[in-house]
Amino acid sequence: MSTINEMWDDLTSSEQLVFKKCCRRLLKETFIVRDIDDDNRKMFFFVKSNEGLFSDYLNLIGFDIVVRDNGVVMLQNNSADVVVSKQRFNKFQSIILCCLWTLYMDKIQSGSLSKQITTTFPELNAELEKFEFKGAFDVKSNLKNALQLFARYNLIFVNWNASDNERVIVLYPSIQFALDESEFATFVIGVRERMMNAGPQSEDVAEDNFDAEEEEE
């Protein structure tokens, strides 16, 4: 079995640069999503072709990778170690993430064959209303910030330059790994209980379940 140094030496100088780029991208954004653009496509296939090297290298700093057949590379904490880093969302951001996750899964389970899964702001608002937290948050002022945060981690994309009538939210396959069904059910129950007991300005923090290495400012 080849060692990390042997696998590294087998790479060309240009491939070594791509390797470093992929590692930086995963540590910064958690996901590489093949279908975002050509740059991400190249990185996805490079990671897939060198999965052993990435796994061995990232294990040294407490991480591992998962390569999915649907075109997603995901960085995760090594289960054998303590949590290295965790992105934390406030309650409102966590609720939006759950709503987007639900919309994505509904569209997939309904048999959508579209290469790009999208949703609209009216669809998202309708899903948000199911949580019955009207008045608890200023939705308009916080929604854009939450969506921009999710875009940072390659979960979604929103073309903010489009007109209101044409603006859609692209849901990347990576969003399905931000929550699984059991975690989603547990989260919803907990949120509804807290929302019933919380005041209008409550900003409880809820943890998501994917890992993200924060950059130093």
What name fits each language-model region?
Residues I61-V67, L147, A151-A162:
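A short, conserved structural fragment
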Residues Q87-R88, P173-D208:
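Short, amphipathic alpha-helical interaction segments positioned at domain boundaries
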Residues F46-F54, G135-R152:
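Short amphipathic alpha-helical interaction segments
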Residues S55-Q116:
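Short basic alpha-helical hairpin corresponding to helix-turn-helix/winged-helix-like nucleic-acid-binding
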Residues V33-K42, G111-E129:
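Short acidic, hydrophobic short linear motifs in intrinsically disordered regions
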Residues T118, A126, K140, E193-E217:
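Exposed, interaction-prone assembly regions rather than primary DNA-binding/catalytic cores
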Residues M1-S79:
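Eukaryotic partner-binding/assembly regions in large regulatory complexes
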